[in-house]
Structures are given as C-alpha cells and as structure tokens.
Regions:
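Re-entrant/interfacial helical elements at transmembrane boundaries that shape
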Residues: 1-2, 35-46, 59, 73-87, ...
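Membrane-embedded alpha-helical segments and adjacent helix-loop junctions characteristic
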Residues: 1-54, 209-279
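C-terminal ends of transmembrane helices
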Residues: 1-8, 45-50, 184-196, 316-318
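Transmembrane alpha-helical segments of multi-pass membrane transport proteins and ion-pumping complexes
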Residues: 12, 16, 25, 29, ...
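Alpha-helical transmembrane segments of multi-pass membrane proteins
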Residues: 13-25, 52-71, 103, 241-255, ...
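Hydrophobic alpha-helical transmembrane segments
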Residues: 14-22, 36, 59-60, 95-99, ...
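Membrane-core helix-loop-helix motifs of multi-pass transport proteins
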Residues: 46-141, 282, 309-345
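Hydrophobic transmembrane alpha-helices of multi-pass small-molecule transporters
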Residues: 99-231, 322, 330-351
C-alpha cells in the first residue's frame, strides 16, 4: 500500500508526506497505532535510502498522526477502548464526538507539518534530482493467499467494530473472534509453524499487567481513594463545569506526555464517574475530555505514547536517531495546537 502511494505521487517527497500522514491517521482508526507506526517508519526508511532524503520529518509526522487518528474511534487507542467499554459507548459515539475534533485537528496539523518540513524535503528532492528506482509494490507480497485472507479478516474486524452496538457484541468478544479467525487463516495459508510463532509472540506480560492494573484500580475505588481525588478536583474547580472539563483535559494531556496513558485512563474512569454524580454533570463531556487529553497529550514527548517509542526506535535503528530536542521542537507546538482546538471544541459543543 505504501509503495503504491509512493508510485502514484511519482516519488515526490512533499506529496508523499501528505499521503503518509493521511494513511497513518486513517489506519490508526482501526489498527493499533504501534503497528501503524512500525510499518510506516520501516517503509519510510526504505524510501529515504532510495530517494536520498532525511526520513525524520516524515516519521515524526506519521507518529503524530497515528496518535491523532487513534483518538477518533473507540478501537484506535487503548485509552479509548477502556473508556468505551467502561462507560458503555459505541464506535459511532466516538466518531460523533472525538472524531469531529480529530478531523479539524488533522487539517491544522497537516498544514503545520507542511510548513515545518516542506523546504527541507523539497531541497532534498532537488539535490537528488536523478531518477528513482523503488521496488515494485507487488514484490512486498510474498504470500498472496495469506495476504488476501488476512485482508478479508481485517475487513470483517472493521465491520464488526462499526456495528457492535447493533450486534451487541463487545469489543472483547470481537477481539477473540478476529484472533481465532487470524490463527485459522494463518494455519491454512502458511502452515502450523506460523501459528505457533504467532502464539509465542503474544505479549503475555502485558496481559498480566492489565489484569493487575484493573484489580488495583478497583481496590482504589473501593477504599475511597479515587473519591478523594474526585472531591479535590471538584473543590479546586469551585463546582464550575467548565473548569472541571479544562482540568481533566489538560491534566490528562500533561500526565500522558510523561506517564503511560493506559493506567492513567483506567484510574480516571471512577474519578469522572464520581464527579459527574456529585455535580450532576453529563459524564459524556468528561469522558471526551479524558479521551482527548490522554490520546493527544502523549504526542508531546518521545516517551508519551508507545507509538512514539516504536517510531523513534525504528528511526534510530535505520541510522537516523531522533533526540528529545528535535522531537519536542516540532511535536510540542503541534500538541499545543490540537489541545487548544480540543479545549475550544469542548466549550463550544458541550458547555
């Protein structure tokens, strides 16, 4: 897909930047942002080697847009899955609420990164000058049967996620169905060894971490610790709904820039429940503030989200290390832009 896009834009760097940003945001709406960034960064490094340009601007843009696109849907980023399943929101609830502001932010970020990197990429393109020879898109597919079958399973997963409110299938149930189908398809098209390798590759440590995390959060809720936090936020805000929303949005963003947003989101669910009950507020606006804060705030630093770590690591392995200075130089202003837009959006639509 990436090589096809590169061929369509005739291997011009600026159109390629736009295409990869759009592709990153779109795919992250349905696929884990880590996976999206990993394969986009890999392809970008390959194209950079052939086309003789610095891949860092493109990789930074891809990372940012993956986190941005993931904020638009329930299945895009882990915090959204936690928020959606805990509070009973559907795929379309997220599209209608967070998806709208993400679309606005994407347009602004597209313009921002183009202004930041256009001259640099155009200069590299002119300096290279000569004809570009890249591998044919078809050569990337080594097993056509497995490719077609996997694409069909992916399409089914998207359909099930979009219609889960109508079918009453939970996100967890859909995940199990898709995982089983993937293993069956892999076994039929690639053999038993491939299935065993995939099962061995499952991150069981992370699964155990999540189990322990939710047990800990339940313990904090039962002992009243989270109610204390909720009461503190209410007291600081003076009972103002607008101030409460701003606190949740910006505290979530700043925290997620330095701390993993998954445990933070899980911890904050009971907190926003308690605030909504105490102040008689619609929990929806608090949920969308939490979602946008945790998803978008992580873009600010190289460690703010797992996709950031994966993208910068891939770039470093390819010979293009991205330091904190260069990362924050471009991504902190971009994060402030999307957070300002999110604040205005929440005020205009809900308050």
């Amino acid at each position: 897909l990436c090589l096809t896009l590169a061929k369509l834009v005739r291997y011009r760097t600026v159109p390629l930047l736009i295409c990869f940003m759009a592709l990153s945001a779109f795919l992250a709406m349905f696929i884990d942002s880590i996976t999206v960034v990993l394969f986009l960064a890999t392809v970008t490094l390959e194209l950079a080697q052939t086309m003789k340009f610095d891949p860092v601007p493109m990789i930074l843009s891809e990372i940012f847009c993956a986190n941005l696109g993931g904020a638009a849907t329930m299945c895009g980023d882990p915090p959204n899955i936690i928020i959606g399943t805990s509070l009973g929101y559907s795929f379309f609830d997220f599209i209608e609420n967070t998806g709208a502001v993400v679309a606005i932010c994407f347009v602004l970020i597209l313009i921002y990164f183009m202004l930041c990197f256009r001259k640099e990429l155009e200069h590299a393109e002119k300096a290279n000058g000569g004809p570009v020879t890249c591998p044919a898109p078809a050569t990337a597919i080594t097993n056509k049967k497995a490719f077609l079958a996997s694409a069909a399973v992916f399409l089914l997963a998207v359909i099930l996620l979009v219609t889960h409110a109508q079918t009453e299938l939970t996100v967890a149930c859909i995940g199990v169905i898709v995982a089983i189908l993937t293993l069956i398809v892999l076994g039929l098209t690639s053999g038993k060894k491939s299935v065993i390798e995939v099962i061995k590759g499952v991150d069981y440590k992370t699964l155990l971490f999540f189990t322990g995390l939710f047990v800990s959060v339940a313990g904090l809720e039962k002992t009243g610790v989270l109610n204390v936090i909720a009461n503190f936020i209410t007291k600081v805000s003076g009972g103002s709904a607008a101030v409460i929303v701003v606190i949740i949005l910006w505290v979530s963003a700043v925290t997620s820039a330095f701390v993993d947003n998954i445990p933070f989101a899980a911890t904050m669910i009971p907190v926003i429940r308690a605030i909504a009950a105490a102040e008689g507020m619609d929990i929806g606006v608090l949920a969308w503030a939490l979602s946008l804060g945790t998803d978008l705030g992580g873009n600010a630093t190289p460690i703010g989200a797992s996709a950031n770590v994966v993208g910068t690591s891939a770039s470093a392995k390819g010979g293009y290390p991205i330091g904190w200075g260069r990362y924050c130089k471009y991504c902190v202003p971009a994060t402030l832009i999307v957070m300002a837009v999110s604040t205005a959006y929440l005020f205009l639509r809900y308050l």
